[in-house]
Amino acid sequence: MRVHFIAVGGSAMHNLALALHSYGHQVTGSDDEIFEPSKTRLAEKGLLPKQMGWNPECISQEIDAIILGMHARIDNPELLRAQELGVKIYSYPEFIFNHSKDKTRVSITGSHGKTTITSMILHVLQYHNVSTDYMVGALIDGFDTMVKLTDDEFIVL
């Protein structure tokens, strides 16, 4: 699958881009500004945009999906081009839902402790060699990214 991220530099967005790239998808992205650690992490995988800003010429019908970051404006030229071409556009939550709708989902909710509880569950599953997809609110020890998306049966969010 070929995926383009509009506003790839955010914490959640760049982790999703890294996850899709590591699973073998062709990933590109753009942003008007990218800060550390996103910048270095994207660069290490060859996903850092060559130039900052929006480039509607990089949007074509060859793209299977656009994932739209929260700070992308409604008049973003790449978004407008994708709409014009009829490319499927997802928000981050929509993309995660579509990927996980047929999986067994373990959802951690509440005001406090979501990342801690998710981390504990992931460590227990890892200890027992249970492969699972996940989305967690921070980078945790023993895991390379905040997001993992594969064909695994389970997802912890």
Which sequence ranges carry the predicted segments?
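Phosphate-binding loop of NTP-binding sites
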Residues: 19, 57-58, 70-157
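N-terminal leader/targeting and accessory segments in enzymes
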Residues: 1-95
